[in-house]
Amino acid sequence: MIERGKFRSLTLINWNGFFARTFDLDELVTTLSGGNGAGKSTTMAAFVTALIPDLTLLHFRNTTEAGATSGSRDKGLHGKLKAGVCYSMLDTINSRHQRVVVGVRLQQVAGRDRKVDIKPFAIQGLPMSVQPTQLVTETLNERQARVLSLAELKDKLDEMEGVQFKQFNSITDYHSLMFDLGIIARRLRSASDRSKFYRLIEASLYGGISSAITRSLRDYLLPENSGVRKAFQDMEAALRENRLTLEAIRVTQSDRDLFKHLISEATDYVAADYMRHANERRVHLDQALAFRRELYTSRKQLAAEQYKHVDMARELGEHNGAEGSLEADYQAASDHLNLVQTALRQQEKIERYEADLEELQIRLEEQNEVVAEAAEMQDENEARAEAAELEVDELKSQLADYQQALDVQQTRAIQYNQAISALARAKELCHLPDLTPESAAEWLDTFQAKEQEATEKLLSLEQKMSVAQTAHSQFEQAYQLVAAINGPLARSEAWDVARELLRDGVNQRHLAEQVQPLRMRLSELEQRLREQQEAERLLAEFCKRQGKNFDIDELEALHQELEARIASLSDSVSSASEQRMALRQEQEQLQSRIQHLMQRAPVWLAAQNSLNQLSEQCGEEFTSSQEVTEYLQQLLEREREAIVERDEVGARKNAVDEEIERLSQPGGAEDQRLNALAERFGGVLLSEIYDDVSLEDAPYFSALYGPSRHAIVVPDLSQIAEQLEGLTDCPEDLYLIEGDPQSFDDSVFSVDELEKAVVVKIADRQWRYSRFPSLPIFGRAARENRIESLHAEREVLSERFATLSFDVQKTQRLHQAFSRFIGSHLSVAFEDDPEAEIRRLNGRRVELERALATHESDNQQQRLQFEQAKEGVSALNRLLPRLNLLADETLADRGDEIQERLDEAQEAARFVQQYGNQLAKLEPVVSVLQSDPEQFEQLKEDYAWSQQMQRDARQQAFALAEVVERRAHFSYSDSAEMLSGNSDLNEKLRQRLEQAEAERTRAREALRSHAAQLSQYSQVLVSLKSSYDTKKELLNDLQRELQDIGVRADSGAEERARQRRDELHAQLSNNRSRRNQLEKALTFCEAEMENLTRKLRKLERDYHEMREQVVTAKAGWCAVMRMVKDNGVERRLHRRELAYLSADELRSMSDKALGALRLAVADNEHLRDVLRLSEDPKRPERKIQFFVAVYQHLRERIRQDIIRTDDPVEAIEQMEIELSRLTEELTSREQKLAISSRSVANIIRKTIQREQNRIRMLNQGLQSVSFGQVNSVRLNVNVRETHATLLDVLSEQQEQHQDLFNSNRLTFSEALAKLYQRLNPQIDMGQRTPQTIGEELLDYRNYLEMEVEVNRGSDGWLRAESGALSTGEAIGTGMSILVMVVQSWEDEARRLRGKDISPCRLLFLDEAARLDARSIATLFELCERLQMQLIIAAPENISPEKGTTYKLVRKVFQNTEHVHVVGLRGFAPQLPETLPGTQTEDTPSEAS
């Protein structure tokens, strides 16, 4: 026998008065004895808190503040705790001998709300030796201990091997563990279940009859028949769904044509517009691409024209600039020619003037010579006259002196005086103060030498004077020539400059002689330089045209390469037309082939669509017509096999349905007639009595009763013997067993149980051996199990039958589709894909177009290359002869060098031309420049000074000589000699004076005549000089003008200037002709550019419009495509065969479908509005929305339980397959599902009878319970009168109310509610719906009234109410009821829990002193009989001889409050044993 679980102990940690206290609980009754405030209620509160840790329920009334409102947070728990961590733990051992410690950690929460934090936990696998207090406390010393926190407890337990610690976040999980381990009797799944459990504990704790429990005894004692209720609900739901499905089938059948019509027209309407937009989008894209290609081509042409225009404009600009420069050069050349001609005329004038000047120069020179000679003669005459005058004066002076001397005494004294005078004059003249007559001789030699020197110098000066006098006029002429050539200069420099000019003149004449050769060489070099420049220009132009720079060495190779290229390009250009013609012919052939394929493509696409549908339907790929015909034969064979299998599955399904119907009979009667016979005989079916047999026991009882398991148990067989006569409506074998149906057991047989079998000894000579059936059906659990397996099998069979039926129909339709395909499309379906061929041909056409464009481009490029090569060869033909010129890099330098030499030579020629005559005249007279004509006066002064010096020297020598001569006169003088000498001298002087005067007269006459002649000559010279100066000034002006003209007026200058002008004129003419050509070409290019620009603007406008249209359409198209893909309708709308229809044909098709759709959706407001919106041509997505709306509308009208698809098109196909079959099947299903009102009444009655029997069994346990005047307690269960009437009507008079139960608009629950209202019109149903009322009427508990009755004294049986009973009687009665509830819970929960667990039973009773000793003894007896633990509390010991008693005394020690506990076990013959650990006081210590 399974042992019942027990609570071993209760541990309180840190509660008020209990620091660490463990109460060992007795197996029966534990008594808490003590005065008021001793801690009895606190201990019980700790137990209840650990049992139900739900703060929303805990409410300890005796400690709640008096007058507290419901808003108070404190429900009596906060004040029972101390600050810090608190624990309440229950140590239990279950039926499996597993020790389980469950409990809660409590902690006061700071604040005014007096909240308590609770954390439930459980400990499993704890060794028996470990006490609970050891787990949660830590001993610090002998007098102190500390309470561990929950985390520390967890860590401590984790260190213990085999111990499991669980902390729970929800109370449901906590109670679930306690239920599974057998600590509580009922699984508390919800707050409502916890509330019931707490109300039970509360009623037990506070005693008395709980009104909360007695009012809801049905909820506590009667189990909810959820299986029956769920069966009714499932049945109703199935019926409702069945009816809705049948109605949907009928509606769908009526709307099938509308489906087809609506889908067909909607598809045509939307697909035509969809494909038209797709075609238009493709056309627009093609047009946009064509526009873009043409735009790019035009842009390239415009860019080429622009480049060409830029090149021509640049070239024109160059030519314009060159023309300007050429015009300027031409004008300059013309002006230069004019200047040269002017210069030549000027040169002629200059030459005439120079000739005149030369003539005047000659005459002027001649006249100058004449004047010079006249001046010289005049000077000579003047000198002669002056000399004559001087001589006359000197002679007169001498004559006077001598005359005077003649008058003095010619004495020696005079001589002496004269000697002295001579000596003094000698001293004075010779500046010799120390001169003596003796030294006079010496000084005389000296002064004579000086005189000789002075005389020589004077002679030299005389010679110079003579030369100067003769060259005076020549010097002036030579100086004038030098000044005219060199410009103003110092006269002292004239000789050196003249010599330099003569030397330079020789060089200049040499250079001037080279002018003509140099000019010819320069002309030749300039011509070559111009040719070189022209060649360089041609080379630069050639390189520019070729786009590459070439070296001179590469030109010949390039010329050969270009000639070879011309030869090859000429062949390519000549063959290009043939290639173009071949490409165009191939293009035309491709176009005709594409047109043919486009006509054939729709037919092929229709065949492919049909073939694809067949492939999708059958899951096969067909590659030839032979495979199609072979598959058709396979379909026929498959159809035959499927039909055979469908019939087999249908037969098996019907058999399962019959078995389910048979097992579903009320009471387990497999034959419906047995129920009627049982009611007729007043008995009960044996299957009903054993209806509660568990699934494990079902095989045993099924084998025990064998064939008699369908027997009827009757109270008395003799009373029904007469009824058996003439009984025909019954099974072949009817078993009747005599016995009390309320207390029937299996004692009527003698049974031996074997291994999976029994031997039943029916009689001494008749045994029956029955094996346990593998599939028992005895008892409700076995039947439900079998029915459940049959239902599962039936579901599989139904699904298989439906699948096979659908496959048969599908195969038949597939056969028809194959037949249609073979008749219509087989001939074209397996031909090559025309669209692939079209794509290939289009690709080839694009390649041809590209090849043509490339060919045209290449041809044009080749022509351009050909022209460029020809131009390059032409340019090279002009360049190659001038390669030497191009290679001659020194030509310009040589030209510059020759130019410089020519300039020097021309400068020399101009110099010679200008000064040649002067140099020729200067050369013979250059020597006269050695003496400056302006130094003649100086020379004369020098001569006069030399003469004076010679005279002074002569006088000094004469004085010295006179002194030397008169040395004798110093002594004496011969006076006779002196007198005779003086007379001779005087005579001579007179003669000479006369001669001198005559000479003076002649000199004066000659001077006057020569002066007149000199004046005449001077006048002629002045006139010549004036004419010469005028001519010279004019010549200088002409030379300046010639210099200002700045040209060389040589003999070839005019020819060169004219040739240069003609060359520039030719270049200018060529430039102007080229410019005119360029202007014309530029005008044509501008016109072409303007045309291209207009075309480009138009193309850009068209392209942008088209692109904007494409982009706009793309945005709409993207929305359309997104909508199409999101809704999965692309396959329906993208009908490729429509792509080959024109826009008008598609628009016509869409318009026709639109007209049909307007009529089709006229009655549907939503579709009508969507269709009206979809007619907007600018919003193509609205047509998709309409199509989706149509599909959605059709999907909503498709029942998924009927048709296994969301696609209305497939739904239409499946409709035709499924509708007829489903109609049949659902009709039969409804007939099978429909339950009769009689069956419902029988089920409810049987359930009521079963529960009444169970309550009677519970009452048997309460018969011996007595409390005070209460002798017995029982539960009375009665059927309500209104509900009994309802059951009678359902079972007997259901025909009168078939209008309710046969109505398709009402469910069975609603019909039952309507019937209840019809039978009880006086009852107000309130706001409840018929469905709710009907569901309540299907619950058997609502048919019963349950109340507690007590047999009290002389009053007999009366209703148990607290007012009619004493306090002790009420407590005992309430406790009895609670024990009954606990037992009922255990019976109800037995199926949910393991069979090897018997849960703990424990109740509370506070203030048990209100019971007398007899009542207490009754409680003890009840606990012993029911194996129940009880915790009671009373001020005094109630029954210390039984159970365990704890004496609690609250004491205060040193301001510390604690409870002193003493525990005693019940009295026995031996001395009472003190419980361990209860003799010492519980002295709490402060936690360190």
Swiss-Prot record:
Pfam families: MukB (PF04310), MukB_hinge (PF16330), SbcC_Walker_B (PF13558). Keywords: ATP-binding, Cell cycle, Cell division, Chromosome partition, Coiled coil, Cytoplasm, DNA condensation, DNA-binding, Nucleotide-binding. The keyword Cell cycle applies. Residues 666-783 are annotated as: Flexible hinge. One of its GO terms (cellular component) is nucleoid. GO terms for molecular function: ATP binding; DNA binding. Residues 1049-1074 are annotated as: Disordered. ATP binds at residues 34-41. It is found in: Cytoplasm, Nucleoid. The hinge domain, which separates the large intramolecular coiled coil regions, allows the homodimerization, forming a V-shaped homodimer. NCBIfam families: PRK04863.1. This is Chromosome partition protein MukB. It comes from Salmonella paratyphi A (strain AKU_12601).
